[in-house]
């Protein structure tokens, strides 16, 4: 937002700013996508190129993030999940970055390093219910049982 005065993905001048490769402009309303997306956002396939997906392409085109600047796919994390950008998640407001497919051990380490280590409070929040990103999580601790995976989100 510092360089272009707009959030990546929401930039309503993106199509004229970056023409090779081509991109799609956002609506310039100050938010990346709809508020509180209910689930993990799928950016794969035709018609799946909304602001949440274009967020990553705009960052690549601006040189802030490496990778194929023609792609709007979200980058993968080390656990095989994705990083996604959205306007609020898990009771957090404003631009939020979420990382999916994290084990309880990794989710707890991230939350403890940057916040309070509790999935339902603070500036870092997590849930094992990837279908309910639009509500505050109810879990009070991360479970490391080898099978439960989490989505962890933080407001930027």
Give residue ranges: language-model regions.
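N-terminal alpha-helical signal peptides/signal-anchor transmembrane segments
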Residues: 1-7
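Low-complexity, acidic interaction segments enriched in glycine
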Residues: 8-156
């Amino acid at each position: 937002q510092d360089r272009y005065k707009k959030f990546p993905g929401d930039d309503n001048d993106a199509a004229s700013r970056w023409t090779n490769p081509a991109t799609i402009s956002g609506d310039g309303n100050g938010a990346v996508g709809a508020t509180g997306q209910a689930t993990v956002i799928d950016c794969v396939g035709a018609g799946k190129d909304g602001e949440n997906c274009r967020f990553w392409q705009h960052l690549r085109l601006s040189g802030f993030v490496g990778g194929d600047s023609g792609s709007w796919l979200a980058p993968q994390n080390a656990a095989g999940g994705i990083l996604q950008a959205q306007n609020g998640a898990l009771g957090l407001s404003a631009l939020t970055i979420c990382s999916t497919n994290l084990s309880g051990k990794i989710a707890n380490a991230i939350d403890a390093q940057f916040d309070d280590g509790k999935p339902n409070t603070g500036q870092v929040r997590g849930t094992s219910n990837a279908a309910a990103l639009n509500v505050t999580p109810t879990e009070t601790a991360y479970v490391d049982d080898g099978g439960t995976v989490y989505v962890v989100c933080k407001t930027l």
